[in-house]
Amino acid sequence: MPVLGAVPFLKPTPLQGPRNSPGRQRRHTLPASEFRCLSPEDAVSVFEIEREAFISVSGDCPLHLDEIRHFLTLCPELSLGWFEEGRLVAFIIGSLWDQDRLSQAALTLHNPRGTAVHIHVLAVHRTFRQQGKGSILMWRYLQYLRCLPCARRAVLMCEDFLVPFYEKCGFVAVGPCQVTVGTLAFTEMQHEVRGHAFMRRNSGC
């Protein structure tokens, strides 16, 4: 996953569901670059990217195919996909969590009353890595969360070698995570979302 020292300032645009009506665009024409929330129909493409990105590094995926479908059915508004000419090239999947720290249950639960957005996975297609897409997608996702009344903070867990990447995205390490997966241990990180009234007033939310 690439690490960027700075992310270009891109004005966030309203996120929409999949565009199924061909009348909204010219025939055979797809937008060069599009950001939108994901749907269960995107699950297979999501899993293919995730599997390739994580299996070789960690030996397992943060989310399996049935879990991806589960979250994209329950809370698609907490996902974000980056599409190039209709092809998924990077994505984030999140859910709501209602505790101060992550626990094992956070891996599979979505609590609609939660105020913490648990980011389960960020992954970029192998042919689009080393281009800064991971940092840009995370930046756009955090801007989007500021438009959601339910979101107060974003939380995630990652292996130690990814801590510098997420620090550059504005996350702060809060200590070792209680969650373990096999022999893997993680650092828990968070990013405050609340208190950004100025950003809300100027982001079209």
Curated annotation (Swiss-Prot):
GO terms for molecular function: aralkylamine N-acetyltransferase activity; arylamine N-acetyltransferase activity. Phosphorylated; cAMP-dependent phosphorylation on both N-terminal and C-terminal sites regulates AANAT activity through allowing interaction with 14-3-3 proteins and protecting the enzyme against proteasomal degradation. PROSITE patterns: GNAT. CDD domains: NAT_SF. The modification Phosphothreonine is found at T29. Keywords: Acyltransferase, Biological rhythms, Cytoplasm, Melatonin biosynthesis, Phosphoprotein, Transferase. This is Serotonin N-acetyltransferase. It comes from Gallus gallus.
